[in-house]
Amino acid sequence: MKVDIFESSGASRVHSIPFYLQRISAGFPSPAQGYEKQELNLHEYCVRHPSATYFLRVSGSSMEDGRIHDGDVLVVDRSLTASHGSIVVACIHNEFTVKRLLLRPRPCLMPMNKDFPVYYIDPDNESVEIWGVVTHSLIEHPVCLR
């Protein structure tokens, strides 16, 4: 998997943008609901530990069923401890990959696409390093301009 790594930049270029507290309907809208506005700073929302956070751009389709697609940007926090079920960035034989970490019944890195094999972790003869826990994914949706 090819990855592009971006470090978390300082807050000097970060701007707060309007954030409406009312949840938006994905069904039929209610015109009677009012909308309360606050400010949302995406850097503060996505980056809990700036010195331990980096961004990766996904390349490949092994995590599509986990809603992580080719081209998405992942927010990865190295200060968090991965646990059973965490989405992690791992380094295997000097190659980076993003997978779901399963610790039981047998430790493995599980792709979220049935077309890809499970990578079983054998602690006796193999070095797998967890580089961080994925906390957010940023998806760019196509925009149709007229």
Swiss-Prot record:
Gene3D superfamilies xref list: Umud Fragment, subunit A
EC number in record: 3.4.21.-
Swiss-Prot/TrEMBL site (Cleavage) positions: 26-27
InterPro entries tied to this protein: LexA-like, LexA/Signal_pep-like_sf, LexA_repressor, Peptidase_S24_LexA, Peptidase_S24_S26A/B/C
Domain of life: Bacteria
Pfam families named in the record: Peptidase_S24 (PF00717)
UniProt keyword terms in alphabetical order: Autocatalytic cleavage, DNA damage, DNA repair, Hydrolase, Plasmid, Protease, Serine protease, SOS mutagenesis, SOS response
Active site per UniProt: 62 (for autocatalytic cleavage activity), 99 (for autocatalytic cleavage activity)
GO molecular function: DNA binding; serine-type peptidase activity
Gene Ontology biological process terms from the UniProt entry: DNA repair; proteolysis; regulation of DNA-templated transcription; SOS response
Protein role: Involved in UV protection and mutation.
Name under which the protein is recorded: Protein MucA
